C-alpha cells in the first residue's frame, strides 16, 4: 500500500546552500520532517550546479515523517538575467530596455527549462522564454 501523503512544500533554495534556518527549517519542522536529512540530500543533489543558483523544489511529506523531493529547473527570470549580464530587469519594460538577447541564447535557456515547460517543441519553448524576456525589458533578436 502507498504511503499517505500529508502535504506538499514548495520552496526555492540556493543550490548547495540548504540549511536549517528559515525558510527550510520552519517549513519542514511544522510537518515533523527531519530537517538535516533533507538539507544533506538537497546539497548532495545540487553539488554539480552553480552554487547559489535558486532551485525550486517540491517536497512531498508522508504520514510516517518521511519525504521525497523533486527539483525543478531554475526560474526563467534568473537564467535570462544571467545571460544578459544584469542584476535586475527593467522597472518599465515597455519604454526602458535594459539588455539584448539573441535567439541562440534563448534556445540555450529553453533547452534548460524544457522539462518544466508545456511547450510542444523547441520553437514554442523559445517563444515562451522570449515573452518572459520582453516582460523584463530585454530586447529579443530573431524571434517574432
UniProtKB/Swiss-Prot annotation:
GO cellular component terms given for this protein: cytosolic large ribosomal subunit
Maturation and modification: One or more lysine residues are methylated.
GO biological process terms on file: translation
Annotated PROSITE patterns: RIBOSOMAL_L11
Summary of the function given for this chain in its UniProt record: Forms part of the ribosomal stalk which helps the ribosome interact with GTP-bound translation factors.
Stored NCBIfam families: L11_bact
PANTHER family attached to this UniProt entry: 60S RIBOSOMAL PROTEIN L12 (PTHR11661), LARGE RIBOSOMAL SUBUNIT PROTEIN UL11M (PTHR11661:SF1)
UniProt protein name: Large ribosomal subunit protein uL11
Amino acid at each position: 500500500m502507498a504511503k499517505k501523503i500529508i502535504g506538499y512544500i514548495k520552496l526555492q533554495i540556493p543550490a548547495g546552500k540548504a540549511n536549517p534556518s528559515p525558510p527550510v527549517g520552519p517549513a519542514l519542522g511544522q510537518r515533523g520532517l527531519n530537517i538535516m536529512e533533507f538539507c544533506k540530500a538537497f546539497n548532495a543533489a545540487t553539488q554539480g550546479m552553480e552554487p547559489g543558483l535558486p532551485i525550486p523544489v517540491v517536497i512531498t511529506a508522508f504520514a510516517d515523517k518521511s519525504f521525497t523531493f523533486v527539483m525543478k529547473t531554475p526560474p526563467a527570470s534568473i537564467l535570462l538575467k544571467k545571460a544578459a549580464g544584469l542584476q535586475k530587469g527593467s522597472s518599465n519594460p515597455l519604454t526602458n530596455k535594459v539588455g539584448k538577447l539573441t535567439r541562440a541564447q534563448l534556445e540555450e535557456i529553453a533547452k534548460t527549462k524544457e522539462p518544466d515547460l508545456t511547450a510542444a517543441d523547441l520553437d514554442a519553448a523559445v517563444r515562451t522564454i522570449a515573452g518572459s524576456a520582453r516582460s523584463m525589458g530585454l530586447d529579443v533578436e530573431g524571434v517574432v
